[in-house]
Amino acid sequence: DIGGGDQFKADFLRISPNNRMPAIVDHDPIGGGSALPIFESGAILEYLAEKTGQFLPVDPAGKYKVLQWVHWQMANLGPMMGNANHFKNYGKNIAKDPSQLEYGTKRFVGEVDRLSGVMDAQLSANQFLAGNEYTIADIVTWPWAFLIGRLIDESMWTSFPNLKRWVDEIHGRPAVLKGRKVGEELGKRELTEEEEKARRELLFNQTNEKVRGAREEAAKSA
C-alpha cells in the first residue's frame, strides 16, 4: 500500500533499500540458492525476461537494442513525467505561491514533450520501441506513455501519431487489459480529505530522517 506507507517499513526496506516500489523476491532464483530480492522495475523486468526466456532477445545485438530503451525509460521518461506531474498537479496542493510552480512545470512538461518526440521518431520506423517484436522495453515504457495525454493535453496526440498508434496497440493486448483491471480494483476506494492530506505529506515531503529508523532496523537484520 503505497499511500499507506508500506514502502517505508523495515521489512520492505530489506528488499528495496531505496524504499520504492516495485520489488520482488524470487524464492526459486536463476542458478539456485537462497531467495533473491530485486528492486527497480528495469532490473526486475530484465531478470524475469532472462528467467522465462520471453520479451528479450538472446543475441547480443538484439538484447542491447532492447536494454538501451529500458534504461532510456528509467533515466528519462519516468523521472521527467514524475516531476512534471508533481509540479503541474500535486504542487498546487502544497505550494503557497502558485508562481513557485511555473518554472518547474514548464521545464518538466517541456521535457516530456521532447521525449514524446523521441519515441514518435523511433516508432515511425518500428512497430515497437526496439524493433518489430514486443519486448520489456515496451512493457516498462507503456504505463508512462499511456498517461502523457492526460498529463499535458489530450490534443497533443495529433503531434505524435506514431506514439499514439503504439500506445493504442499495446493497450489492446489481453495481458495489459488484465493488469489494468487489477490496478483499477486497487484504486477504487476514495480517500477522505484527511487521508489524502496525510498521503501527500507522506509521498511528497520525504527526507532521510523520515525513514532513518526503518532503515537502521532493516540493516540490523540484513
Features from the language model and the residues they span:
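GST-like domain detector, emphasizing the conserved glutathione-binding G-site
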Residues: 1-106, 116, 210-222
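Short, solvent-exposed turn/loop segments enriched in Gly/Ser/Thr/Pro and often Arg
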Residues: 3, 136, 183-186
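Alpha-helix/helix-capping structural signal
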Residues: 43, 174-175
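GST-like fold's C-terminal all-alpha helical module
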Residues: 69-174, 220-222
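Segments of small-molecule ligand-sensing domains
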Residues: 180
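Acidic/histidine-enriched, glycine/proline-rich intrinsically disordered or flexible terminal extensions
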Residues: 183-222
